[in-house]
């Protein structure tokens, strides 16, 4: 359930099912069971106009390499018709200094990704879905992409779902995090609440043995004892608990699980 006016970060290891979810939304795969609802309707019941309110941006590029920006824009304007916003397109092309006359084949990866995102935004979608859109980009290009997304989401009727292995990007922009593991949704949680609820604590063997085991999510052995992902509220105040990043929470839950009842 992606809330309007929010960004959902979709995380999980390779093979967890993130891209499969996106392919199901796109209609490239048939589901085995369950239903997918978008705009309050089953995805199979969406009209062509409603489908054009969804935009996708992928890690790979599908532009004819011998085209320039003007030719790509013309193709998209014909396809999207009344939904196409040339003013938005021209504004973003100018903002990011993309060359109108050069062939797409001469573009860097960062330039191609910016063009992909600009094209997606220029038919005024209500739902924007990105699959590894910042993968392989340098930090400056990634930051530019994140700025575009944050501008887009200022409209509270818009929503973004972004699947990424670069979890530091999601730390910056996501409102909620959905964690998928082996095809199972482990949690959907507010990002700030995740960081408030979980932490990492280093313990001697004696401290570990005396700790309330209900507080422990995952454990990693180290030279001096144990390092644990814990529920902060159950940890004694005399122990120093470090903040856990989203990446640490995911890795600990997958690799170092302590509580078998978590069913991860």
Describe these PLM feature segments:
Residues 46, 195-197, 236:
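A short local loop/turn or secondary-structure capping micro-motif enriched for an aromatic residue
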Residues 217-264:
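C-terminal coupling/interaction segments
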Residues 48, 83-91, 192, 206, ...:
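Generic alpha-helical secondary structure signal
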Residues 1-162, 167-168, 172-175, 181:
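ABC transporter nucleotide-binding domains
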Residues 145-230:
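ABC transporter nucleotide-binding domain
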Residues 128-129, 207-211, 234-238:
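Short, surface-exposed beta-strand/loop "edge" segments at domain boundaries and coil↔beta transitions
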Residues 70, 167, 208, 246-247:
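Alpha-helix N-cap/helix-start and coil->helix boundary motif
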């Amino acid at each position: 359930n992606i809330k309007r006016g929010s960004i959902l970060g979709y995380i999980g290891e390779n093979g967890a099912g993130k891209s499969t979810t996106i392919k199901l939304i796109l209609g490239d795969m048939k589901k085995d069971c369950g239903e997918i609802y978008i705009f309050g309707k089953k995805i199979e019941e969406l009209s062509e106009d409603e489908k054009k309110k969804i935009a996708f941006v992928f890690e790979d590029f599908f532009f004819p390499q011998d085209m320039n920006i003007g030719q790509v824009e013309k193709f998209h304007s014909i396809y999207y018709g009344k939904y196409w916003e040339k003013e938005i397109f021209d504004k973003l092309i100018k903002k990011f200094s993309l060359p109108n006359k050069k062939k797409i084949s001469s573009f860097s990866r960062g330039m191609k990704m910016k063009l992909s995102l600009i094209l997606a935004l220029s038919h005024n979608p209500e739902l924007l879905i990105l699959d590894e859109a910042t993968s392989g980009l340098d930090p400056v290009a990634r930051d530019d992409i994140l700025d575009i997304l944050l501008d887009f989401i200022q409209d509270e009727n818009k929503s973004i779902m972004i699947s990424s292995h670069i979890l530091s990007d999601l730390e910056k922009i996501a409102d909620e995090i959905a964690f998928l593991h082996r095809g199972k949704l482990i949690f959907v949680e507010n990002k700030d609440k995740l960081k408030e609820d979980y932490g990492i604590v280093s313990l001697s063997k004696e401290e570990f043995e005396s700790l309330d085991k209900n507080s422990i999510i995952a454990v990693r052995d180290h030279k001096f004892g144990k390092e644990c992902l814990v529920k902060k509220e159950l940890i004694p105040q005399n122990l120093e608990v470090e903040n856990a990043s989203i990446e640490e929470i995911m890795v600990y839950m997958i690799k170092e699980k302590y509580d078998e009842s978590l069913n991860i």
